[in-house]
Amino acid sequence: MKEPLLGGECDKAVASQLGLLDEIKTEPDNAQEYCHRQQSRTQENELKINAVFSESASQLTAGIQLSLASSGVNKMLPSVSTTAIQVSCAGCKKILQKGQTAYQRKGSAQLFCSIPCITEYISSASSPVPSKRTCSNCSKDILNPKDVISVQLEDTTSCKTFCSLSCLSSYEEKRKPFVTICTNSILTKCSMCQKTAIIQYEVKYQNVKHNLCSNACLSKFHSANNFIMNCCENCGTYCYTSSSLSHILQMEGQSHYFNSSKSITAYKQKPAKPLISVPCKPLKPSDEMIETTSDLGKTELFCSINCFSAYSKAKMESSSVSVVSVVHDTSTELLSPKKDTTPVISNIVSLADTDVALPIMNTDVLQDTVSSVTATADVIVDLSKSSPSEPSNAVASSSTEQPSVSPSSSVFSQHAIGSSTEVQKDNMKSMKISDELCHPKCTSKVQKVKGKSRSIKKSCCADFECLENSKKDVAFCYSCQLFCQKYFSCGRESFATHGTSNWKKTLEKFRKHEKSEMHLKSLEFWREYQFCDGAVSDDLSIHSKQIEGNKKYLKLIIENILFLGKQCLPLRGNDQSVSSVNKGNFLELLEMRAKDKGEETFRLMNSQVDFYNSTQIQSDIIEIIKTEMLQDIVNEINDSSAFSIICDETINSAMKEQLSICVRYPQKSSKAILIKERFLGFVDTEEMTGTHLHRTIKTYLQQIGVDMDKIHGQAYDSTTNLKIKFNKIAAEFKKEEPRALYIHCYAHFLDLSIIRFCKEVKELRSALKTLSSLFNTICMSGEMLANFRNIYRLSQNKTCKKHISQSCWTVHDRTLLSVIDSLPEIIETLEVIASHSSNTSFADELSHLLTLVSKFEFVFCLKFLYRVLSVTGILSKELQNKTIDIFSLSSKIEAILECLSSERNDVYFKTIWDGTEEICQKITCKGFKVEKPSLQKRRKIQKSVDLGNSDNMFFPTSTEEQYKINIYYQGLDTILQNLKLCFSEFDYCKIKQISELLFKWNEPLNETTAKHVQEFYKLDEDIIPELRFYRHYAKLNFVIDDSCINFVSLGCLFIQHGLHSNIPCLSKLLYIALSWPITSASTENSFSTLPRLKTYLCNTMGQEKLTGPALMAVEQELVNKLMEPERLNEIVEKFISQMKEI
């Protein structure tokens, strides 16, 4: 109710207000001022003010304020004198002070201190009392409204309330369906169509598993259960997400979309990294889905822009309504009046000391505003309805121009800041459907599922065709924002990432951005996704060709990695930049092969080289290759009847202790039995205790799928420092499987015996030290090394490079022979170089070395070492053979021992002595002096004939006797003692028992031994009848020399005569014997790859980064199998499947 004004006061008020009308500014100077003026008018129009009151010291004087009607007639309100009272705000209850302006609502006597107080008071008065909320999960009352989490789940129309995120997660786990994509081709009955077909999806919902055979059945299942279908509306492809539920979280009056409760927790964090573009994706991840909202408010999902365009074109062609009518209807709808919910303010009360004439405020309703929008085919237009926060009678109209075929070079977006004062119907142009373009509906809204929802609008601009509406009131480049951020690195381009709100020199910034490389790339990418009939019709064929091309290129990548791994070459180079002359083995080989494959492959290489050259992608491919190779080995192991493990210790470049694990097993073929020793990989060992090592080895073998019930042997590096640890490992394995015999490494024991032999005799140790100094001096000078090779014909093969390595002493016979035969010439060369050298220190070193090699003692020790090592070298080479077995090894060890024992007499010593004197005579003929041996009279020598008799202690009477006792006899006794110690401390009982049963068919059968073997190995049948048959059959049919019989040759006889099915128990014993590891040579071979694989090692890498390349370098036979077309296709498919799961 308006209060009436007195006649005289009304005239004064009218005169005072009309006098200030001329001071009102009616036209803005620029667009920014115009925008500010429009916003001010809108705010004033929402609050209609009617009267103003003024309070003096003694009374409240009512001022004047007009509510101007549409006719423009102003009515004056009289001043009303009142008694001085204390006034407070009806909203916030604050006391109104002197000079403060108060506001009064129309039809109400309550006063307010500000407009927000009025709005808040109206909202609290009009809104109903909040009802009592209950948590949908725990059923507890939610006392604090701020703790309420309202979530609209996908299969319900109403919202569910929760008291906390934990309750939301618990509720979600109870009811959400789990969708699993099936990769195995298993025929099962479909839960929807009831047909027996290959199942594509498994959906677990409410503890019930549903098998679905196709995308159509999946869509029906979702529809039947009222789920939001994550399926393409056009092609039906399932667009998978980490959770099949979609949540809408209401916070602060806004709707936020999340795919799970975990996403709600991670709200306002940085967005996830974009997925790597992977070729041949039959399934689309959710962040590549396109969500559109139709006119009716229905949400539709599409797997690609092409699917969206095809669906939109088909929908438009089927509709009988033209685009012009659509735009007209939309404009009409926007022009329709809305219900005004804005409070109307009746009075403004001024608490001033004196009466001040107030200006008349024009509160006429703002005229309808129209924003003209220009639409092209390059963007999707959103003519969304005005939000409740906009003026109630604001209208929007759209003008549409005929689109162009390609995106415009200038495509920017900005917030619409201006509105026309009248409807611009003259600018409306009819839009026809082009035969070459497929446009989406004008009212569609496009957004990413995981991204923020945003509408895309365009308004007319003189120089720039497209402008996008932004809530931030900033300008964006449409093409760069939509395409470039995901596929290119946009750096600090403001128009693509941050936008710009600084309108100074805006056109200049726009033109500069048009010429940038990022903008041109985004436009080029945009053109590939045009809504054309040709692109839609040829989409399947083009996509199929791209898939095949990408697969061929991926095969090329895998072949390169296999080849480089087989050759033990590093993939990466020191400088892999574009300008580098040598980019590394991988890039150089890839570029060369891509050129040979054709222009298309070369183009793919240039576009995807950074992707496949990344360390992570190469590691993923190597990991898949490693898995394939290990699976092949494990299949062979599990198909065999028995296997043994061979382990050695090593240290990688990160100084971490590792174990090299190999397996030995027999493999039956059509004509023979092959002995396979395969390398399985390196395993880190945190502790070097027996229990921990046993657990580490067993865990690794079980992880890769080895059947541990078939283990029948174990061998380890038996050096002195590791012997105790490996004995504990063997004991742990024998607790679980007593038949896993501990067979020591014979190669290591032979090496230990030779080392002790060379170190325990003083003269031999001194001679080897002099020999090492000689080779070190020769290698120091290239000229000296060339002279030695040319003069004495010492090839690199005859000169052992590892002369100072203890592990190479067993094969020093070749080196010793080279030095012995050429010693006079070596001494002569040293003399010449020492006399002509300008370096005095080097000359002194050569002179000292010349004195040492010219001694009789040095020559004698060389002759003696060669005589011993030349015999033990035969056994050392035999132990490196993978086909060696216990039976043949025992005879060879006995032969070595017999040979060395038989030479412990004066005859063989005299042979060495005479040979030494002959060489010294040759040196003397060259003009050099040889230092003769001297007799050490005070040294006691103990005879070896009777070690317990102290009377045998004597002094040698001659130099020859001294050399015979001190060097020759003592050296032979040392080597014989060590060999007997090493090869006699093992328990050969079980091994010899099987050897006797299989090889000694001409001797009487020992049934007690046979029964013991049967019980120990838990054979299923009685072994005695098989042995009786086998012995008679072998006598009549096996024509073979007893001296060359071994387990391998016996296995060939079993296959030739078909005895495996006749005597299964004996055949099993034969396979067990073939699996026994006599040596860990294969493990040593794996160690030889480490120096060549140093590129793959760094301080942060463990065995996972090393096992893959080492497998390719050691198991080259398996690498060749992986290069077959079928196996390559399997690796390609596994890599693609792995990339989808990222």
Swiss-Prot record:
Bias type Polar residues, positions: 385-396
Zn finger intervals (TTF-type): 452-538
Zinc finger (MYM-type): 110-148, 160-203, 210-245, 300-331
SUPFAM superfamilies: Glucocorticoid receptor-like (DNA-binding domain), Ribonuclease H-like
GO molecular function: protein dimerization activity; zinc ion binding
Low complexity composition-biased segments: 397-413
Cross-link (Glycyl lysine isopeptide (Lys-Gly) (interchain with G-Cter in SUMO2)): 25, 284
Main location: nucleus
InterPro entries xrefs: DUF4371, HATC_C_dom, RNaseH-like_sf, TRASH_dom, Znf_MYM, ZnF_MYMT-QRICH1
Keywords: Isopeptide bond, Metal-binding, Nucleus, Repeat, Ubl conjugation, Zinc, Zinc-finger
Location in or out of the cell: Nucleus
GO cellular component, one term: nucleus
Protein name, as recorded: Zinc finger MYM-type protein 1
